[in-house]
């Protein structure tokens, strides 16, 4: 994975007030951004997240370097997941 690769994240309330969806790791004291290598995997996994059902969510692509910058400024880790929600990699930006 290079900083110029596209990855996929879930966006909450796309538009002017959008933000990248974060989650709390089960059994751990760490918050993270779920990220995916494939858009379809992110769409399939969306139903597995703790979300506010009154808000709208969509999957969007982001440059990996930009995601790392966002995660670092927000104090979040990045967890790469597969479509079943299995953690493939944990990144501390």
Predicted regions and their residues:
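Conserved NAD+-utilizing ADP-ribose enzyme module
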Residues: 1-93
């Amino acid at each position: 994975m290079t900083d110029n690769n596209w990855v996929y994240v879930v966006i909450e309330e796309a538009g002017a007030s959008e933000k990248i969806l974060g989650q709390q790791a089960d059994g751990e004291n760490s918050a993270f951004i779920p990220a995916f290598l494939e858009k379809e995997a992110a769409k399939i996994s969306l139903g597995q997240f703790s979300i506010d059902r009154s808000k709208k969510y969509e999957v969007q692509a982001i440059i990996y370097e930009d995601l790392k910058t966002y995660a670092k400024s927000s104090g979040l880790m990045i967890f790469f997941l597969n479509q079943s929600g299995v953690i493939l990699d944990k990144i501390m930006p």
